Amino acid sequence: MVEKVPMTPGGFVKLQEELRWRQQEERPRIIEAIAEARAHGDLSENAEYHAAKEAQSHNEGRISELEDLTARAEVIDLTKMSGDKIKFGAKVKLVDEDTEEEKTYQIVGDQEADVKAGRISISSPIARALIGKEVGDSIEVNAPGGSKAYEILQVSWG
């Protein structure tokens, strides 16, 4: 059975845009670079040729990965999400019970995670601890820097 990959509509669009760019812009540019490097003669010591072939390999690998991800994507319509329990797509406001520092995170798919932008992967330790909880609940997260305790202040959607 094919495992679905949950993602937000915005995350899906970003993957589609990257796939289009790699197929329609980057692939032709690399093919042109290979042809140009090949024209320089001896390929055994041709650094430009080897660099272009390596770039081609990387690009084709990423294209395959993006095609797989978009085929398995389960786009979750966040506008239809509601309720008090935390699940995929929720924006969660937390307070660190030790430092009183407040943080807001949105739980997103693995491909969309960007901690600096406040988006955490659904498979991250903190998101796994949050799933199923509600406002007022406390969670404990075992992170590389040690154990942290948070209280859930707010859950919102969209």
UniProtKB/Swiss-Prot annotation:
One of its GO terms (molecular function) is RNA polymerase binding. It comes from the Bacteria. InterPro entries: GreA/GreB_C_sf (IPR036953), TF_GreA/GreB_CS (IPR018151), Tscrpt_elong_fac_GreA (IPR006359), Tscrpt_elong_fac_GreA/B (IPR028624), Tscrpt_elong_fac_GreA/B_C (IPR001437), Tscrpt_elong_fac_GreA/B_fam (IPR023459), Tscrpt_elong_fac_GreA/B_N (IPR022691), Tscrpt_elong_fac_GreA/B_N_sf (IPR036805). Keywords: DNA-binding, Transcription, Transcription regulation. Pfam families: GreA_GreB, GreA_GreB_N. Gene3D superfamilies: Transcription elongation factor, GreA/GreB, C-terminal domain, Transcription elongation factor, GreA/GreB, N-terminal domain. GO terms for biological process: DNA-templated transcription elongation; regulation of DNA-templated transcription elongation. Necessary for efficient RNA polymerase transcription elongation past template-encoded arresting sites. The arresting sites in DNA have the property of trapping a certain fraction of elongating RNA polymerases that pass through, resulting in locked ternary complexes. Cleavage of the nascent transcript by cleavage factors such as GreA or GreB allows the resumption of elongation from the new 3'terminus. GreA releases sequences of 2 to 3 nucleotides. Belongs to the GreA/GreB family. This is Transcription elongation factor GreA. The gene is greA.
